[in-house]
Structures are given as C-alpha cells and as structure tokens.
Amino acid sequence: MPAAKVCVLLLALVGTGLLSACGGTGPNFVAKDEPWREAEERSCVASGVVHETAFIRSRSALGGPSVCGAEHPFEMSAADGGRIRLKPAALLRCPMIPQVDRWISTVVAPAAIHAYGVPLAEITVAASYGCRPMNNVSGAMLSEHGHANALDVSGFILADGTRITVKKGWKGDVRERTFLRRVHDGACEEFTTVLGPNYDSNHRDHFHVDLARRGKTGLNRVCK
C-alpha cells in the first residue's frame, strides 16, 4: 500500500484489540474497538431519557476517521430546563446529556448560590466532540472526546455578569475557590472521569468530565 494511504494495523491479531493508524494523513491516535459504546448509546436513545427540546436537538450521526463518532448525537445548548446556557453548544452522545444536565442543575447552580448568592446563567464550553488523541498528543489513545463522550468546561457566568474561570479562579479568592471546588467535587458523583487543575498542566484551565468505562466492571472512577 502506498505510504500516502491510510495504513491500519490490526493489533487485535496479537490480542490487544487496538487499532492504530500509520502513515500519511491517517488518524494520529491509537483506538480500541469497544462494542459496549454502540449498545449503550442505542439503549439510551430507546429509553427516551433524552428527548428533543428547544435546547436539546438531535443531530446527524458522527463518523470517522477510525472509531470516532456517535450514532445518535445531540446538540445541547442549555441545561436545567433551558435556564442555564451552554456556549458554544455541546455535541454529545445520548448518555452524557442527562449526566451533564444533572451536574449543572444539582451541583453547579447551587454552588453559585452558595458562593455568590447569584444564579448561574451560562457555562463556557471549551470542548465536546472532537476526533483527536488524549491531550492532543500524537500517537496517544483516542480521547473520549472522539466518542462525543466528554465535555470540557472552562468557565461560568452568573446572572449579574460575574465571570469565574477555572484558570484564574482555581487559586483565586475565597469565593472562586469555594465555588470551583464544589463544582469539581460534585462532578465526581456524576461522571466516571473528572480531571482538573490538580491533575496536570493540560487541565490547568478547564474541568474535563466523561463517562468512560474503567476496570473490569466499567465502574471504576477517576477524580483528580
């Protein structure tokens, strides 16, 4: 095969179950074939737990390259019954929608009232769907963002215009620190992965949350 064409190594032949792209313009990440993703997504859609509204819209299937994508993604532009905006709108797979909504409505919004006495108005979305390796490091494993199974949040805007960013507020004043730690710690109850500034420099300016399956049961959690 010419070098300019995508070369896919079926490492599953040696028992790893991994797919790795090589050469030319092919994917720059290592991916794993995980049948549970498709089954979980279809089950979520069939359950009706996510339905279309003015702020949750069904979108066309996301596909490729490699195993990137989602069969039934949704675009989420607001949470908590439309009261709290997500800007820009997040493109996510079905199982992420109710978790994000619950986190925002039961954790983030109350944290704003607790720390500032002001309602939360908007969430600043740093990333949702994106077919790329973890931390954008070429050759790394495919990020959960590549499955529309992750959300990065970099900031929050209150109803009075107050802006709190993860980058400045994590070590900011008392109210910023109180608010952001409640938001971070509360996320650990809703998602299997939560990464923030204490994890590494790649997350110094945002919170990463996802629903990756970890461990033999798929229920292991990472909260850092």
Question: Can you describe what each PLM-predicted range is?
Answer:
Residues 1-22:
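Sec-dependent bacterial lipoprotein signal peptides
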Residues 16-40:
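Bacterial Sec signal peptide processing site at the extreme N-terminus
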Residues 23, 40-45, 67-69, 93-95, ...:
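Sequence contexts marking disulfide-bonded cysteines in secreted/extracellular proteins
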Residues 25-30, 142, 149-151, 155-224:
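Catalytic cores and adjacent binding grooves of peptidoglycan-active enzymes
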Residues 43-123:
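Active-site acidic/histidine clusters and adjacent loop/turn architecture
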Residues 57-68, 121-133, 201-207, 212-213:
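Acidic helix-start/capping segments at beta-turn-to-alpha-helix junctions
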Residues 114-148:
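Active-site-adjacent substructure of cysteine-protease-like catalytic cores
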